């Protein structure tokens, strides 16, 4: 039985005091949540205080990026070792915004996945197709390429530690969302690709989140699908009360 993981991705929003205030509110709201793992991805400047703000709760903290080296002369970069040292447990990798704006390749994302696993943290690997790719019938081709590239050369033992987040790019921040049935169909195809790579037993253990404009209104229907194991939530995670409504839908 896969455990639901509902994660928020704050992107480049919230200063430190705003982050601490929101996390303190979320910690209080979720104190009785037992059936869902809760994660918040926060900006680098907030991470240390974010970890302290949720200490002793079932809310965990993620970084939104890393550089795939443990240390070295890489001016301006942050290593997974630095993040683990302050108590960060997850890292969001391969988000469509990183792929588009910073031209991150599947090969580079794969290096990041390996670096995060090597240090004992949990990667959340984002995959997703653009609108023209979906309309052109290339959804599965695009996702398979991203999965096979992002998870290349991983052992079965490593693969089960990775969370895959399917985020249709056409649904991020647009208000559009896949129907629960569309999302389930794609998640099943993603799991089939994982089974090709690592075998069915491993694929059945890998958590696959949905991340295309999940909000309180559609969360329950999405999370009730067989192959949807949580959410990677953008805008609706910025307020503790709306994020809590999504968590309740999973709990």
Spell out what each predicted region is.
Residues 1-251:
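Active-site loop-to-helix "anion-binding N-cap" substructures in soluble metabolic enzymes
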């Amino acid at each position: 039985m896969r455990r639901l993981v509902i994660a928020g991705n704050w992107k480049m929003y919230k200063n430190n005091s705003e982050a601490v205030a929101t996390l303190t509110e979320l910690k209080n709201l979720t104190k009785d949540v037992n059936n869902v793992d809760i994660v918040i991805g926060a900006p680098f400047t907030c991470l240390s205080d974010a970890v302290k703000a949720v200490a002793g709760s079932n809310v965990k903290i993620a970084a939104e990026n890393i550089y795939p080296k443990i240390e070295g002369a890489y001016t301006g970069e942050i290593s997974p070792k630095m993040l683990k040292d302050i108590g960060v447990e997850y890292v969001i990798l391969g988000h469509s915004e990183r792929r588009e704006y910073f031209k991150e390749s599947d090969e580079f994302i794969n290096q990041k996945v390996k670096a995060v696993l090597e240090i004992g943290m949990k990667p959340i690997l984002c995959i997703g197709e653009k609108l023209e790719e979906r309309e052109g019938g290339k959804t599965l081709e695009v996702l398979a390429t991203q999965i096979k590239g992002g998870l290349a050369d991983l052992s079965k033992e490593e693969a089960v530690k990775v969370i895959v987040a399917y985020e249709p790019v056409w649904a991020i921040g647009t208000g559009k969302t896949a129907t629960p049935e569309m999302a389930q169909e794609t998640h099943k195809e993603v799991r089939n690709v994982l089974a090709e790579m690592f075998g069915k037993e491993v694929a059945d253990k890998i958590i696959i989140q949905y991340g295309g404009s999940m909000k309180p209104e559609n969360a329950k229907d999405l999370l009730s699908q067989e192959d949807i194991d949580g959410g990677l939530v953008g805008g609706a995670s910025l307020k503790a009360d709306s994020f809590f409504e999504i968590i309740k839908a999973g709990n």
